[in-house]
């Protein structure tokens, strides 16, 4: 069955509407903007699908549905190569004999009472495989990890284990 994710949460990019360079600069590393997990999956799936955003679904036999082109095929290819390169340099994420594309994310938790951010973090890792002909995309998210504030130490090993399982299970 397809779950309609279109109305589940909203990303917030209001900070970018004023066009200030500082807001664009800080948004490049995740400050002043927010995105839901499903929107993050949709964005990265557009990279995995040569620039075409797909309608998200979970474990269904229905055919994937293209929504629209959001970036050029060339841009998607360049970003994929960067994501593959990041994994090849990070032994924790690398899966031998496979080309996997992935990216870590570590974000500070907003302080809604005082403004700004708390010292707590959210760790994410998102990736797809095989990088050249993607069959799946995985997002691992961990809220406020204890003792290991960097995504590379928390969610990356979980991604690697799950991706290896999926690759083996489906004989990819």
What does each of the following model-derived ranges do?
Residues 64-67, 156-172:
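Short, gly/Ser/Thr-rich active-site loops of penicillin-recognizing serine hydrolases
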Residues 1-144, 151, 172:
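Beta-lactam-recognizing serine transpeptidase/beta-lactamase-like catalytic domain environment
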């Amino acid at each position: 069955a397809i779950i309609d994710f279109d109305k589940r949460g909203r990303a917030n990019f209001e900070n970018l509407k004023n066009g200030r360079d500082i807001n664009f600069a800080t948004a490049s590393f995740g400050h002043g903007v927010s995105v839901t997990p499903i929107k993050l999956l949709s964005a990265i799936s557009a990279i995995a699908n040569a620039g075409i955003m797909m309608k998200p679904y979970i474990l269904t036999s229905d055919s994937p549905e293209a929504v629209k082109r959001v970036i050029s095929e060339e841009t998607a290819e360049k970003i994929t190569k960067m994501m593959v390169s990041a994994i090849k340099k990070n032994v924790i994420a690398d899966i031998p004999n496979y080309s996997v594309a992935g990216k870590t994310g570590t974000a500070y938790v907003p302080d809604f009472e005082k403004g700004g951010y708390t010292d707590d973090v959210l760790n994410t890792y998102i990736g797809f495989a095989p990088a050249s002909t993607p069959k799946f995309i995985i997002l691992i998210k961990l809220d406020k990890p204890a003792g290991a504030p960097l995504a590379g130490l928390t969610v990356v090993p979980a991604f690697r284990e799950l991706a290896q399982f999926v690759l083996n299970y489906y004989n990819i």
